[in-house]
Amino acid sequence: MAAKEVKFGRSAREKMLRGVDILADAVKVTLGPKGRNVVIDKSFGAPRITKDGVSVAKEIELEDKFENMGAQMVREVASKTNDIAGDGTTTATVLAQAIVREGAKAVAAGMNPMDLKRGIDLAVAEVVKDLLAKAKKINTSDEVAQVGTISANGEKQIGLDIAEAMQKVGNEGVITVEEAKTAETELEVVEGMQFDRGYLSPYFVTNPEKMVADLEDAYILLHEKKLSNLQAMLPVLEAVVQTGKPLLIIAEDVEGEALATLVVNKLRGGLKIAAVKAPGFGDRRKAMLEDIAILTGGTVISEDLGIKLESVTLDMLGRAKKVSITKENTTIVDGAGQKSDIEGRVAQIKAQIEETTSDYDREKLQERLAKLAGGVAVIRVGGATEVEVKEKKDRIDDALNATRAAVQEGIVPGGGVALLRSSVKITVKGENDDQDAGVNIVRRALQSPARQIVENAGDEASIVVGKILEKDTDDFGYNAQTGEYGDMIAMGIIDPVKVVRTALQDAASVASLLITTEAMIAELPKKDAPAMPGGMGGMGGMDMM
């Protein structure tokens, strides 16, 4: 086991604080409408330019191990806030830095760290309650567009695109952001459920111009195994032919003789049919087939359930108003599933999202949820250069997350004003002086986001904050973009409550841990072994015979 270095008390906290400051100072320049850019060097390709706090935080790794521990703890604040609320990472970082700084001073002055932490927790709980009480619910599409615009650093078109996407697919619907091949940013909406598997043979196409297979009012057979011969399927195929309706087969694979037979029947005109592979792999494939079954009112033909292909009847097949299949995607529109069954499945997936600890699983579950809950919207981000597209995509992702958060818990005045107002309203008292000091730490820290926004805009923070607090109305604040004072909500400067709340809770949680740290342990840097001596030169005059 390698030797370790241990630091205690003040020297540990000083090192840690230096790491916190380095990371927070790099992140906080991006805050607000006049936030500056940060350029990040990449080991390959062009440098990346971003105003996204969490992207900056993720890039920072310090040489000194003790400083790096402080930096990584604050990076954790940014990541956690990003995971829960999807935005507010810079605000969380600024708050964490302010609480740690004030807390370190208090501990150095001889106060009890645990009492300080209790005081901080008391104040944060009161502020969260105040924020939720002040929240204004979001109802109209215009308000959704406003939130999107603010989070996209004032770019109105992004706000409008997000509002339109949410209007079309619902607040729970999936909205994905992709890089476009063109210079324009565009929005495409896919109604119904779409998955990324296309037809198994181009002979299934019904519209040769567009190379699409369209099936109207179709039956859907869901089979979890491979189909290599059709003998077992003949009874159900004959039943479908008699109804005169088309059939879509979704199976692990359809190959060899089975595929050839289907194609021949399709070409002879006896059977309107198409076959696609089931989406996903392994257990996820089973779950997605079950989703499709619930959406279309069918049953998955699975030997696990004791259902054999020979015994399948028409009422086990799913139904859909329209199925559209391209080379790459299948879209099922208006499935015949019961609304109550679909809602039950949605609730089940939501519960799984709450329980999962894996980011990848959570993302896949959210995709499944959205497909069930109503359609998919794709925002394709265009730009003149790759660097511009990546920067814009960052902003749209942020704006999308902020908008979702706003729809969930409502909005408060932006620009750091909500926290500023809450700082004045903290009335809670601790059990002793040290706890009161903890409450005061939060009171002072709540001013830091507003101050940073004003400083980034090149104005004098103390004067602006003083002017805002002179007025007693909750919505009165400072527009850093235009340099004017006024009603923040009327000016469209708003923050989702979920973002502000999460930023404060995560910042206070990690900052409290840092304040109560008394020892730090890190591995000693390894000393490199001395280099091998060079080989001896040939000796003069000693030629080989």
Swiss-Prot record:
ATP binds at residues 30-33, 51, 87-91, 415, 495. Pfam families: Cpn60_TCP1 (PF00118). One of its GO terms (biological process) is protein refolding. It comes from the Bacteria. One of its GO terms (molecular function) is unfolded protein binding. Together with its co-chaperonin GroES, plays an essential role in assisting protein folding. The GroEL-GroES system forms a nano-cage that allows encapsulation of the non-native substrate proteins and provides a physical environment optimized to promote and accelerate protein folding. This is Chaperonin GroEL 1.
